[in-house]
Amino acid sequence: MNIYDQLQAVEDRYEELGELLSDPDVVSDTKRFMELSREEANTRETVTAYREYKQVIQTISDAEEMIKDASGDPELEEMAKEELKESKAAKEEYEEKLKILLLPKDPNDDKNIILEIRGAAGGDEAALFAGDLLTMYQKYAETQGWRFEVMESSVNGVGGIKEVVAMVSGQSVYSKLKYESGAHRVQRVPVTESQGRVHTSTATVLVMPEVEEVEYDIDPKDLRVDIYHASGAGGQNVNKVATAVRMVHIPTGIKVEMQEERTQQKNRDKAMKIIRARVADHFAQIAQDEQDAERKSTVGTGDRSERIRTYNFPQNRVTDHRIGLTLQKLDTILSGKMDEVIDALVMYDQTKKLESLNN
């Protein structure tokens, strides 16, 4: 099937989806309605570009016809030639865009995410750097118009972050932040370093797509839920009523503790969101490991131990090791202006996928 047959098939399916989403039987089936709505949303940009492309093809045909008929009218002929030139350039641009749009879509790209950041090797300095990463993602979320909600956090004695779990909600969050999973290394002089030596520390980032209950159902028998009193600074109980929730997925041993909210039900709901995402991610990771060769052909959103980026403070430098990108803009990037890095990762991933399709 050539590219034009593929595009026509996508447009035909898009029109079929519009009809299905008006079908009362589909509307009453929540899971099917969500699946079809997501499929329609994922193909909308491709269909819009294809329809615009067909208009450009028609414009080229009309301009060529006009040139034939413009004999004796140099002004009309010149105008038609200019339109033909512009339309042919637009045609090439649309063809490149459509090739990318036809690449297999990641079904999670439009989803919200659960973001986890942990201080790793480097003690207090690693925890402080984890806090810097949290601020970077919060500010980037602001620039994108996303909602950023810290769901659970644990700090150390110097104000750094041992661990933080956040929900980031908005348009296409996963598509932009999915490349952030991995080990982030920092090189800088700690405030406690009297000799001015540069220390290296690490923080880890994990990005998981939010998983709706209708998409991934956890059997209640597979969960152990403990209720206990929330503790404040110094470990004292801060609530007379037990509101904190500890949830364990027995088959995998995955555990979530939640005590940020004032009510047990809210803590239970948040814990369920996180554990559903972690369990789904756990099994998705197993499946992804079985397709190791395929994963290595792209940017790499799978290997959680992979050192993906280095932040060098003395040189104001950020290096993404996966794509060989180096920018002397560390201060800018940590302030939340991440577009240059993320756009480069997306472009690299798309290019690699195009190459693998052509081979």
Curated annotation (Swiss-Prot):
Keywords: Cytoplasm, Methylation, Protein biosynthesis. Peptide chain release factor 1 directs the termination of translation in response to the peptide chain termination codons UAG and UAA. Pfam families: PCRF, RF-1. It comes from Streptococcus pyogenes serotype M1. Gene3D superfamilies: 3.30.160.20, 3.30.70.1660, 6.10.140.1950. This is Peptide chain release factor 1. Its main location: cytoplasm. One of its GO terms (cellular component) is cytoplasm. Methylated by PrmC. Methylation increases the termination efficiency of RF1. PANTHER family: LD18447P (PTHR43804:SF7). The keyword Kinase does not apply. The modification N5-methylglutamine is found at residue 236.
